[in-house]
A protein has these predicted regions:
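Acidic/serine-rich, low-complexity amphipathic helices located in mid- to C-terminal regulatory regions
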Residues: 168, 173-175, 568
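Internal active-site segments that recognize and position negatively charged phosphoryl groups
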Residues: 156
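Conserved "HGTGT" condensation-loop signature of ketosynthase/thiolase-family condensing enzymes
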Residues: 1-138, 159, 178, 186-207, ...
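Alpha-to-beta junction loops
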Residues: 165-168, 558-560
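Compositionally biased, intrinsically disordered linkers/stalks adjacent to structured regions
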Residues: 142-144
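Short conserved active-site loop signatures built around small residues
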Residues: 150
Length: 584
């Protein structure tokens, strides 16, 4: 069993857990006029943290000369809270097999939006910076699956603990408002000019927010004290479209049912669902359909807290995990602020209720590309009845001894050596390192579709589909992607336009194809893969993390085969794409 032993949070509704509980109980929204983001679009409300960068630096005792983006500052603030809440010292954490796993999409882009320097978009640097500023000497990992990033960070942390790869994991996510993603969402025409209204008939879009939240995770047998237990989780893919969801919300449905199955719970056992609930017409309708598929006609309390915090994108999953834990501890259901009129085919959200007992809670986080994840959080550490018989994935129980004698997670070998010789067999391995090799993409992708792809996407598609064909597969069980810099070509184009021409020029097409999980989700869409889907972006360590995950999926029986890819543009404008199939 996995225990949450510490929590930390900062968002538009509070700089700590005490302030956050007060805001939740009062239904106090943190959404308002732009104050700190230097944008021309002041008519669009946002959920900003109520502190400037200078105020955050002063609070955190970070010297002015030390580089730290707003994303980093928010993350450090929440991290320090979580560590203190767990009753652990930095020295104790550093002396154990400990890991910091963070989810983000923006990274340091809030700094770039105010400079003439376009960096290599390395999200992994931000996670390393946070560890350094917190004094942590630990392994670091960055997950980037858009709006499900931080929930997937928590899932990864639980998996590492269950399989003996770590003793302490600090997992969550951080995201600051930036001109890049603010105008990117604006280009998609999904930002509301009024405070958002999740699941309301008049909903007209989301309000972006910012913040950070982290949880300290430990095996329950080693936990000093426990605030909550994480019993179930699932990461699935809708495999439909980069920004839209399928009509029956297959990814969301699979994530929720998978989390329930792992927890050993029936739908009737869940006392509250914290919905993703972005207030966009598409999300709220599809999520309502998915919830009805899972829970039927159960009179189940459901609400979205984004009417208070705004949509904190990559940080939303961990922020809402902490909100769920606070609601469980204090006996209330967070209100669905802004809701007044039922929507057609929609769920009826709770507007808030005090004095309730919440034993089992589900938290949803759904991202661009159909990267959908769900988490089941419980007050009791007792095993669910289904879990005892069904196993973790339905394919067999995890090997609880896997990796326990491996201090660095791969026994001193490189991860590739471990993947080849310890768990699984590489049955196909395809590499492209020259743009000229892209001429073969027509054998796999129609010309019209290929014309809309940047060169890195073409390379990733070509190596992935060729590896699948060589291994005799059409659809992999899981897709694990590594990329140090993501869709750099598209990102640089957007940043150049933003810096040279201003905020009115953002291309919605480029924005949709700029997130680090674009490649993994596009491959899932192409191959109709609804299984586990994650993207690692930790610099030169990205591929190692991907191989470790693929190995874990196979050793725990969660997958028979995994498509693992490493896709990056080189500094000289070239490309490198490698895809392999790891099979049991």
């Amino acid at each position: 069993m996995i225990s949450v032993t510490g929590i930390g949070i900062i968002s538009a509704i509070g700089n700590n857990t005490t302030e956050t509980v007060t805001s939740l109980r009062l239904g106090r929204s943190g959404i308002g006029e732009v104050r700190y983001l230097n944008t021309v679009h002041h008519s669009l409300p946002v959920g900003e943290v109520k502190m400037s960068n200078d105020e955050l630096r002063t609070l955190l005792h970070i010297p002015a000369g030390t580089f730290a983006s707003r994303t980093t500052l928010l993350g450090v603030h929440a991290l320090r809270q979580a560590i203190a809440d767990a009753g652990l010292s930095v020295g104790e954490i550093s002396a154990r097999r400990s890991v910091l796993i963070s989810g983000t999409t923006v990274g340091d882009m809030d700094v770039v939006g105010h400079s003439n320097v376009i960096p290599q978009w390395s999200l992994g640097r931000e996670t390393r910076d946070m560890a350094t500023l917190c004094g942590l000497d630990v392994e670091v990992c960055t997950v980037s699956t858009a709006c499900s990033s931080s929930l997937n960070a928590i899932i990864l942390g639980c998996e590492m603990l269950r399989n003996g790869e770590a003793d302490i994991v600090i997992a969550g996510g951080t995201e600051a408002l930036s001109l890049l993603h603010f105008n990117g969402f604006r280009s998609l025409m999904i930002l509301d000019s009024h405070p958002c209204r999740p699941f309301d008939a008049t909903r007209a879009g989301l309000n972006l927010g910012e913040g950070a939240a982290y949880v300290v995770l430990q095996r329950s047998s080693e936990a000093g004290h426990t605030r909550a237990f994480i019993k179930g989780y699932a990461n699935r893919c809708d495999a439909f479209h980069q920004t839209a969801t399928s009509a029956n919300a297959e990814g969301a449905y699979l994530a929720m049912t998978g989390a329930l199955r792992m927890a050993g719970l029936q739908p009737a056992d869940i006392d509250y669902v914290n919905a993703h609930g972005t207030a966009t017409p598409d999300n709220d309708l599809s999520e309502s359909r998915a919830i009805r598929r899972v829970y039927g006609k159960l009179d189940l309390p459901i609400s979205s807290t984004k009417g208070m915090t705004g949509h904190t994108t990559s940080a939303s999953g961990s922020i809402e995990t902490v909100l769920c834990i606070l609601a469980m501890e204090n006996g209330f259901i967070p209100p669905n602020v802004g809701w007044h009129e039922p929507m057609n085919e929609g769920i009826l959200p709770y507007v808030g209720k005090d004095t309730v007992s919440l034993e089992n809670v589900m938290c949803n986080a759904f991202g661009f590309g159909g990267n959908d994840s769900s988490l089941v959080i419980c007050r009791s550490g007792e095993e669910g009845t289904l879990r005892k018989t069904a196993g973790h994935s339905g394919r067999g129980e995890a090997d609880e001894h896997c990796g326990r004698d491996e201090a660095d997670g791969h026994g001193g070998k490189t991860c590739e050596e471990t993947a080849r010789h310890s768990v699984g067999e590489i049955v196909s391995d395809v590499t492209i390192d020259n743009v000229e090799q892209l001429k073969d993409v027509g054998a796999f992708i129609p010309p019209m579709a290929a014309r809309r792809m940047c060169k890195l996407m073409k390379a990733a598609m070509l190596t992935s589909l060729r590896a699948l064909r060589e291994s005799g597969l059409e659809t992999p069980d899981a897709i694990v992607t590594a990329t140090a810099y993501g869709m750099r070509e598209n990102s640089v184009k957007m940043l150049n336009d933003l810096l040279e021409y201003g905020e009115e020029t953002m291309s919605p097409t480029l924005f949709m194809q700029s997130t680090h999980n674009t490649i993994g989700s596009a491959i899932a869409i192409q191959t109709k893969c609804h299984g586990y889907n994650i993207t690692y972006t930790q610099g030169e360590k990205s591929f190692e993390w991907a191989l470790r995950d693929a190995r874990r999926l196979i050793s725990t029986g969660q997958a028979e085969n995994v498509l693992v890819g490493w896709h990056d543009e080189t500094d000289d404008g070239g490309i490198f794409s490698r895809s392999l199939i790891l099979r049991k």
